Amino acid sequence: MTIEKLDGTSPRLYTLVAPLVMRRSVLRQNNNYPFWTSRSHTWFVAWEGETVFGFVPVEITDGGVAKINNYYVSGDDPRLLSRFLREIIQYYHRDYTIRSM
């Protein structure tokens, strides 16, 4: 499985996550709160073949914070969530304070 890092407005991001974020079942897991993105976001997307298994958008704030506001992991797989967190920590820990809301 690959975890790909994508800019928040990348056309590839939309191609990968649109089928998930438009599903009612995925939105329910996010308390019916829509997923959103911007140029301030970087998304970590786990995929293999034609299947996306999850994603974690990270927003960089003016205060030097890498903020995780929501995520989706298929089947609530704790191993995949841990892998996402390791990737995010490795990428941001030197330059940003990492916070999850």
What is each residue range found by the language model?
Residues 24-47:
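Active-site rim helix/loop that mediates acceptor-substrate recognition in acyltransferases
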Residues 40, 62-64:
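Short acidic/glycine-enriched loop/turn segments that link adjacent beta-strands
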Residues 64-76:
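Conserved acetyl-CoA binding element of GNAT-fold acetyltransferases
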Residues 92-101:
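Conserved GNAT acetyl-CoA-binding A-motif
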